[in-house]
Structure formats: C-alpha cells, structure tokens
A protein has these predicted regions:
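Membrane-interfacial loop-to-helix junctions in multi-pass inner-membrane proteins
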Residues: 43-53, 79-88, 111-125
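Transmembrane-helix bundle segments that line or gate the permeation/cavity pathway
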Residues: 24-32, 60-108, 124-151, 184-188, ...
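Short, membrane-exposed interhelical loops at transmembrane-helix boundaries
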Residues: 245-251, 318-339
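A C-terminal functional module that forms or caps the active site or interfaces directly
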Residues: 295-325
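Alpha-helical transmembrane segments
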Residues: 8-22, 82-95, 122, 126, ...
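Long, contiguous internal "core" modules enriched in hydrophobic/ aromatic residues
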Residues: 108-288, 308
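Short, highly charged, low-complexity non-transmembrane loops/tails of multi-pass membrane proteins
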Residues: 365-379
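N-terminal signal-anchor module of multipass membrane proteins
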Residues: 1-59, 63-66
C-alpha cells in the first residue's frame, strides 16, 4: 500500500460516510412534514415514532463522518470546522433540538407542550439538510479561507483562518450553494416520504405521502439538475501533479467523470434507482418498498459526486480567498503511518454495518401502527 493509495482510500471512506448520511437524512425529511403527513395528534405521534426508531443512526453517522474527516484529513477539519464554525454550530444545534424533542415531547411535566417539541423536529428537518447541502456544495464552489503552514513555527501555530468575519455563513450568500442545499432538502423529503410509506401501516398517512412525493420530486429535480449542469460546465479546481499548484480548469468535473468513467456509470445507476423507487411508488398504490431502491440509488449517486470532487488531481476544498490555499487529499491528509493504521481498523467496519442492518431488520419486521404508539415507552 502506497501513501497515494491510502489517501484515495480514505477519501473513499469519507465519501461513503457522506453518502450514507444523505440517505439517512430521511429522518429529517419525514420530520419536516410531521404536520402535513399527520393531521391528528395520534397520526403525528405515529410519524414521530417511526423516525424515532432511526434518528440515532443518522446522528451517529453525522458524528462518524466528522470523526473520519478529523482522523484522515485533519487540515480540512481544522479549516472548515474551526473556520466556518458558525455554519457547523447551527447545523449541530438543530440536531440537538432533534434529540431534545424526541426525549421530552411526551414526558410528564412538559410545560412547553407536545407541539412545541414537534416544531423543533420540523426545524431540524429544514435546517439540517439545507445547511449540510450548502456546506457540501462548497466542495465544488469554494470557501473563503487562507492556509499558511509557515505559522507552524510561530508562538500561536494557527495555520488556517477564515478570510472574513462571517465564519462560514458567507457560504449561504452563494446562490448555487443554496440551490444544492434546497436539492438536498427536497431529496430528504422524498426519502422521508418513502420511508414513512414503508414503515407505517396507516392508509391515510400513506396516501398523503404519495401526494407530497410528486411535488417534492419535481422540485428536487429542478434544483438538482440546475446545480449538476452548472457544475459540470463551470471551471473546476485542478491540481498540477508535478508542482502541486492549484489551477482553474474549464469543465474540470465533467472531465473527471469522463476520465473516471466507472464513476459516471455508478452515478447513472444511482439516479435510475432513485427515479425507479420514486416512480413506482407514485404509480402503484400497493408498492411500499420504494425506500430501498431509492436509498441505494442516493448512496451511489452521492458517492460518485464526492469522489469526483476529490480524486483525479482535484482540490476537494477550494479557497476563493487564496487559490493556493485550496485543500487536496495530498496536502491535507494525516501521516502515512496514521492512514495505514486506520486502514486496518477500517476492515472491521463491515461487521458494524452488518450489526446495524440486523438491528434495523429486527425493528422493522412489524409495521408501526396507531395502537403501538399508545405504549408508555413510545415517543
């Protein structure tokens, strides 16, 4: 195993975790529609308990995603999470609201009322996907930071800092970051609807979900296709492999997909699976398993996009303030010893995934009903 192989391997692992996180945000997507899917207190409690079975998996994946970045690409972690901390703090705060809501909305002594905590779930369902999508869009559009490794020898060894006082909120001023954020938001709603249709045994909730699935899909396609076409045709942040200098290359991301044609196939298969899962669910009233082809499709498509952003001599975290401060998998990664050690540890990941799959299967063997949420231990 060479150092270059380990760099690419760990970008693949980080990309896979990011792709899984996007899929698991069906929790946020469903929670954003608590009041539109459930018209009565009982129906809303069914929706909340359905997502309540999975919210910890989503949150754990988010933390693991950040942890993998910290361990494998620490300069990115310190630059983004340390520099753009207002953006990340808002995201994390919305997930804290989610955890608090699940824990206390139906507890005795709740002076705020159940609806207040349910609105917290709605807030997380909107803010989480929107801002996470905007943050990921900066991988293609750039952020405003400066890296100066010469500061390693100074009294205060801070080698990266944000170039303005917004500390990450300036990402929301780029309309294309918002376009992708909205695409992720509506994708989360699509997945959330498909999950509820599959997980909840209630015809009223399922029929409302089918209606909202059409609108969310159309809106998602508008935002996603606009971002995709613009990204493939715009200049990208390329790395000169001989000098390490960052240069602008016309249609860089399109060239990446052509050069790494297996990724193009993976992306296309992912899109087809997503559309199949959505389309069949809309057309057939008896088909309730659309979450699985759609979910697999989302993981494949997002994985391909993330790999396109970091492989093939591409700067995965470009700097708009100083082009040469842009981060690549080569200049931001951990030492070869660290990456190699973590490689062996990562071989245990399939066993963890298998355990999660088993627990998921055990929880979902029986569809959720109104009778089940009357239990005292329900959310």
């Amino acid at each position: 195993m060479t150092y270059i192989f380990l760099q690419h391997y760990w970008w693949f692992i980080v990309s896979l975790l990011g792709a899984l996180l996007v899929f698991l945000m069906f929790v946020q997507g469903a929670n954003s529609m608590v009041f539109s899917l459930g018209h009565s207190d009982e129906e809303r409690r069914v929706v909340v308990n359905s997502t309540g079975r999975k919210w910890e998996i989503t949150f754990t994946t988010l933390v693991t995603f950040g942890g993998a970045f910290f361990a494998s690409f620490p300069l990115f972690y310190s630059t983004s999470f340390g520099g753009a901390y207002w953006l990340w703090m808002i995201i994390l705060f919305s997930f804290v609201l989610q955890a608090v809501s699940y824990e206390f909305q139906n507890k005795l002594g709740n002076i705020l009322g159940t609806r207040t905590f349910q609105w917290m779930l709605v807030a997380n369902g909107i803010i989480g996907p929107l801002l996470l999508g905007g943050a990921v869009a900066t991988f293609f559009n750039g952020s405003n930071f400066v890296v100066d490794k010469g500061n390693l020898t100074s009294f205060q060894p801070v080698i990266s800092h944000w170039a303005n006082a917004s500390y990450g909120l300036d990402a929301l001023l780029d309309p294309w970051n918002l376009v992708f954020g909205l695409a992720v938001f509506f994708l989360a709603r699509i997945l959330g609807t498909l999950y509820i249709i599959n997980n909840v045994d209630d015809e009223n909730i399922r029929s409302r979900g089918s209606v909202r699935l059409v609108g969310c899909t159309i809106t998602f396609l508008i935002f996603f296709l606009a971002f995709l076409v613009r990204t493939l045709l715009k200049e990208g942040f390329a790395v000169d492999p001989s000098t390490g200098l960052i240069v602008m290359e016309p249609m860089k991301y399109l060239h990446n997909l052509i050069a790494m044609w297996p990724l193009l196939i993976v992306f296309a298969v992912g899109v087809v699976l997503l559309l199949y899962g959505v389309g069949r669910t809309i057309v057939s009233k008896t088909y309730i398993k659309g979450i699985w082809p759609a979910g697999i499709g989302v993981v494949l498509a997002v994985l391909a996009l993330m790999l396109c952003a970091g492989w093939n001599n591409t700067a995965f975290y470009p700097s708009n303030a100083d082009l040469q401060s842009s981060l690549t998998i080569a200049n931001s990664c951990s030492s070869e010893f660290t990456l190699r050690t973590m490689f062996y540890v990562s071989l245990l990941v399939p066993f963890v995934v298998a355990y999660i799959a088993y627990v998921w299967y055990a929880m979902d063997k029986k569809k959720l009903t109104k009778e089940e949420v009357s239990d005292e231990e329900a959310y």
